[in-house]
Amino acid sequence: MEDFVRQCFNPMIVELAEKAMKEYGEDPKIETNKFAAICTHLEVCFMYSDFHFIDERGESIIVESGDPNALLKHRFEIIEGRDRTMAWTVVNSICNTTGVEKPKFLPDLYDYKENRFIEIGVTRREVHIYYLEKANKIKSEKTHIHIFSFTGEEMATKADYTLDEESRARIKTRLFTIRQEMASRGLWDSFVSQREAKRQLKKDLKLQEPCAGLPTKVSHRTSPALKTLEPMWMDSNRTAALRASFLKCQKK
């Protein structure tokens, strides 16, 4: 699984996932399923944000190519992917600027159009079960929840899906592609089942050999949001990143 993750995801996503795991004392080489899950979640958060802006009238617009007008403001502030200290700094800055209630837990995004924090979920299980788990943990109506599954299902607070259908379809397609790529390499079952994952881990540790059949090339095409990893994510210089294209798994 580790080799698959490093081949399938953008190197910047992989690096962020590694840092996040190490921050909590976890080893990506051992907890490979969690490594894959974190990379997937990061990519969904970035795709959620990509290309969405607010114009001078306060309307949400999509700009997919070229440099948008400097007056445009990014609709979403990305919080996921930061170390905890910087993430809370961003959250506090947003709360002080907008007057919204500070969340108890770190959210993934902030939506400047709807003036709300967003919690993104990506699940291998039933979306409604994962949604309820998120809601019970957060216990706040102020944070919007949006759950995606690898089967194309989704669930959001009050059925408000925030994004347009095409933008959500991109995310669903990417998740389905990841599932298919895992399945073709015999990794999906262990990714879904903890029991199977433990069995696979013991086998991998015993063999200590790289997985066969993995693609030999890594895509270095960077999602626009990945180019925004500066100390604070609130300036308009991020717009030049729109020239980049979405990352996709490369097949051998």
Swiss-Prot record:
Plays a major role in the shutoff of the host protein expression by cleaving mRNAs probably via an endonuclease activity. This host shutoff allows the virus to escape from the host antiviral response. Hijacks host RNA splicing machinery to selectively target host RNAs containing introns for destruction. This may explain the preferential degradation of RNAs that have undergone co- or post-transcriptional processing. Belongs to the influenza viruses PA-X family. Its main location: host cell. One of its GO terms (molecular function) is RNA binding. Gene3D superfamilies: Influenza RNA-dependent RNA polymerase subunit PA, endonuclease domain (3.40.91.90). InterPro entries: PA/PA-X, PA/PA-X_sf. The probable endonuclease active site in the N-terminus and the basic amino acid cluster in the C-terminus are important for the shutoff activity. The C-terminus acts as a nuclear localization signal. The C-terminus is recruited to host protein complexes involved in nuclear Pol II RNA processing. The active site is at E80, D108. Keywords: Decay of host mRNAs by virus, Eukaryotic host gene expression shutoff by virus, Host cytoplasm, Host gene expression shutoff by virus, Host mRNA suppression by virus, Host nucleus, Host-virus interaction. The record marks K202, K203, K206 as: Important for efficient shutoff activity. It is found in: Host cytoplasm; Host nucleus. It comes from Influenza A virus (strain A/Guinea fowl/Hong Kong/38/2002 H5N1 genotype X0). The record marks R195, K198, R199 as: Important for efficient shutoff activity and nuclear localization. This is Protein PA-X.
